[in-house]
């Protein structure tokens, strides 16, 4: 019985870390940046769908519904939509696809439905798709949600994070953003969203798959860093935070701008 309990705890821990990209603060940052760049028309339509609540309010909804009535009534099928795995030497196209879907197929399906079949969707479906798009565009930019299949998106790569054992996946899900700055999500937004129009335009161009492959490239740098230490369980602390804070900031900012672009396109 004791052995079963230990195994169950391990499995639950894996499920938890594999879904919570950026943590709630990171998702709030992405949604808040996007909200600042919505067109007036998109704002009105979103405000109506969400009954006056903001997309920030629902940015982590897709994580929070696990083990809820929503989850038991079919949304457990979206469990694999939070990520896609790409092994070293592969691209998204050359990897065997998850039969349950992934972050790209989920986003593509919902965006197409919201753009081309909007009038035929029920209000409840529109609302749920909106909440999930807000969340998954954030996950699309979280490096370990584009990690290798061989180590389950960084879950199998153990590291010491300020002398505490964890996984590379967990570092990027929430620990990195909490260690980089002691800011609230609104302070993150105020300090990140200061770029020029040209940068925004360039970042907003592209497809979900192209954006995802950019995240894969960034994930590769993290794997290279960890492997270069030569340690069985690499020790990561202040130097790692210093070296990769710019990547953290860039991914959050880009996700916010791209989410705004997606929503403005849907609600044009």
Task: Cite the ranges covered by each PLM segment.
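Residue-level micro-sites within transmembrane alpha helices that shape
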Residues: 2, 14, 138-141, 257
């Amino acid at each position: 019985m004791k052995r079963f309990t230990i195994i169950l705890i391990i499995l639950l821990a894996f499920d938890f870390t594999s879904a919570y990209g950026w943590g709630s603060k990171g998702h709030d940052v992405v949604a808040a940046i996007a909200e600042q760049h919505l067109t007036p028309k998109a704002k009105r339509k979103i405000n109506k769908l969400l009954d006056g609540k903001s997309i920030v309010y629902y940015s982590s909804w897709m994580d929070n519904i696990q083990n809820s009535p929503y989850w038991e009534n079919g949304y457990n099928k979206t469990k694999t939509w939070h990520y896609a795995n790409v092994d070293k030497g592969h691209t998204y196209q050359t990897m065997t696809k998850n039969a349950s879907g992934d972050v790209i197929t989920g986003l593509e399906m919902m965006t197409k439905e919201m753009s081309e079949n909007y009038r035929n969707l029920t209000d409840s479906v529109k609302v749920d798709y909106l909440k999930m798009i807000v969340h998954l565009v954030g996950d699309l930019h979280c490096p370990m949600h584009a990690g290798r299949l061989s180590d389950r998106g960084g879950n199998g790569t153990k590291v010491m994070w300020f002398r505490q054992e964890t996984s590379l996946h967990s570092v990027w899900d929430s620990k990195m953003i909490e260690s980089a700055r002691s800011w609230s999500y609104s302070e993150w937004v105020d300090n990140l969203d200061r770029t020029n129009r040209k940068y925004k335009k360039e970042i907003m161009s592209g497809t979900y798959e192209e954006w995802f492959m950019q995240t894969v490239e960034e994930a590769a740098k993290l794997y290279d860093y960890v492997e270069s230490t030569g340690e069985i369980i690499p020790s990561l602390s202040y130097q790692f935070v210093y070296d990769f804070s710019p990547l953290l900031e860039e991914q959050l900012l880009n996700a916010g701008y791209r989410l705004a672009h997606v929503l403005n396109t849907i609600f044009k």
